[in-house]
């Protein structure tokens, strides 16, 4: 079973006298920086001189430096920019200032797991990854609660890396809810698999295939949209709140019978075998190499596939129907 740490297992005293730099001010960056500051941590934000986020961070009372300046000052450097930017930011702005005794932290393990960043041996390397978007991390913190986080230690040069990671997690509110111990490998591989096979790739492909099946059988696209895309949120919300069993309890008997008898005909053993292939590509580095090469090459195939997806008929139907839904923010 996973080990879970709470407020009593962590101490902000570990961060006393230590300077923290949060590199990036996007969804997670702003939440980490503001929560740490409100927890009494000495924090500064590292942003490029031309970043549009500099003014916002300054307006919110944070000290704003360049990534290099922030890294030079800090004892603990948390890198919270997009994965594809990490290598350059690390090489240009962090590595020259990453002296022995410092700590390098991440919100996702991708670049460490696949060896794209290799910190020196004398540096602690840890991860604190909230299991929720930044705006939720900030809002719940202000309410006196927290969002669960994953914590991991990749390199414990100081012998105190876990205590530092837990103190950081406490500073952003994570130990209020629970900090689950994991590894960089487990976090990275499961996160990528979830995105590709279930949450993003799997769900979007399933929705499109269902929509196409109904339209090709002669049903109106608008009704197909409601049945295959729009109502998905209703079901996911039930699962989110109480699991699959609670969702099944909440739907009609007809829907539940169709679920348990027809669902396995959609996600067949062949589908699960393909899921395993996707997982194997994540574990052996095939996906990482493919994605890094695609990004380094200007993302031609990625851009083409995204643009093709925008042309799917379900997008046009949705654009026509969503204005009818007053509860959706426009």
Swiss-Prot record:
It holds the Pfam family KARI_N. The keyword Oxidoreductase applies. The keyword Cell division does not apply. The active site is at residue 108. Pathway: Amino-acid biosynthesis; L-isoleucine biosynthesis; L-isoleucine from 2-oxobutanoate: step 2/4; Amino-acid biosynthesis; L-valine biosynthesis; L-valine from pyruvate: step 2/4. Its EC number is 1.1.1.86. Residues 183-328 form the KARI C-terminal knotted domain. NADP(+) binds at residues 25-28, 51, 53, 134. Mg(2+) 2 binds at residues 191, 227, 231. GO terms for molecular function: ketol-acid reductoisomerase activity; magnesium ion binding; NADP binding. Mg(2+) 1 binds at residues 191, 195. It comes from the Bacteria. GO terms for biological process: isoleucine biosynthetic process; L-valine biosynthetic process. Residues 2-182 form the KARI N-terminal Rossmann domain. Its cofactor is Mg(2+). One of its GO terms (cellular component) is cytosol. InterPro entries: 6-PGluconate_DH-like_C_sf (IPR008927), KARI (IPR013023), KARI_C (IPR000506), KARI_N (IPR013116), KARI_prok (IPR014359), NAD(P)-bd_dom_sf (IPR036291). Keywords: Amino-acid biosynthesis, Branched-chain amino acid biosynthesis, Magnesium, Metal-binding, NADP, Oxidoreductase. PANTHER family: KETOL-ACID REDUCTOISOMERASE, MITOCHONDRIAL (PTHR21371:SF1). Involved in the biosynthesis of branched-chain amino acids (BCAA). Catalyzes an alkyl-migration followed by a ketol-acid reduction of (S)-2-acetolactate (S2AL) to yield (R)-2,3-dihydroxy-isovalerate. In the isomerase reaction, S2AL is rearranged via a Mg-dependent methyl migration to produce 3-hydroxy-3-methyl-2-ketobutyrate (HMKB). In the reductase reaction, this 2-ketoacid undergoes a metal-dependent reduction by NADPH to yield (R)-2,3-dihydroxy-isovalerate. Belongs to the ketol-acid reductoisomerase family. This is Ketol-acid reductoisomerase (NADP(+)). It comes from Frankia alni (strain DSM 45986 / CECT 9034 / ACN14a).
């Amino acid at each position: 079973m996973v080990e879970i740490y709470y407020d009593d297992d962590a101490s902000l005293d570990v961060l006393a006298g230590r300077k923290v730099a949060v590199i990036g001010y996007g969804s997670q960056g702003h939440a980490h920086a503001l929560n740490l500051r409100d927890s009494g941590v000495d924090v500064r934000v590292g942003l490029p001189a031309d970043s549009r986020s500099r003014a916002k961070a300054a307006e919110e009372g944070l000290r704003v430096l360049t990534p290099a300046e922030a890294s030079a000052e800090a004892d603990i450097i948390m890198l919270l920019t997009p994965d594809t930017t990490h290598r350059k930011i690390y090489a240009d702005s962090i590595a020259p200032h990453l002296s022995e005794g410092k700590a390098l932290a991440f919100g996702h393990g991708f670049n460490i797991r696949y060896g794209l960043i290799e910190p020196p041996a004398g540096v602690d390397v840890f991860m604190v990854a909230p299991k929720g978007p930044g705006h939720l991390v900030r809002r719940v913190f202000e309410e006196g609660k927290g969002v669960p986080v994953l914590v991991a230690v990749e390199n414990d040069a100081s012998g105190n890396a876990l205590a530092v990671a837990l103190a950081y997690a406490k500073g952003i509110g994570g130990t209020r809810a629970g900090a689950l111990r994991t590894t960089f490998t487990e976090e990275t591989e499961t996160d990528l698999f979830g995105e590709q096979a279930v949450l993003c790739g799997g769900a979007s492909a399933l929705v499109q295939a269902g929509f196409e099946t109904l339209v090709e059988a002669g049903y109106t696209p608008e009704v197909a949209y409601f049945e295959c895309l729009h109502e998905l949120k209703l079901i996911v919300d039930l699962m989110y709140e109480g699991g699959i069993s609670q969702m099944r309890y909440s739907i009609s008997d007809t829907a539940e019978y169709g679920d348990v008898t027809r669902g396995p005909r959609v996600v067949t053993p062949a589908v699960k075998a393909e899921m395993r292939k996707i997982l194997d590509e994540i574990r052996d580095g095939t996906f990482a190499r493919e994605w890094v090469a695609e990004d380094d090459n200007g993302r031609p195939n990625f851009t083409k596939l995204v643009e093709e997806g925008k042309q799917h008929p379900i997008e046009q139907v949705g654009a026509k129907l969503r204005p009818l839904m007053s509860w959706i923010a426009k």
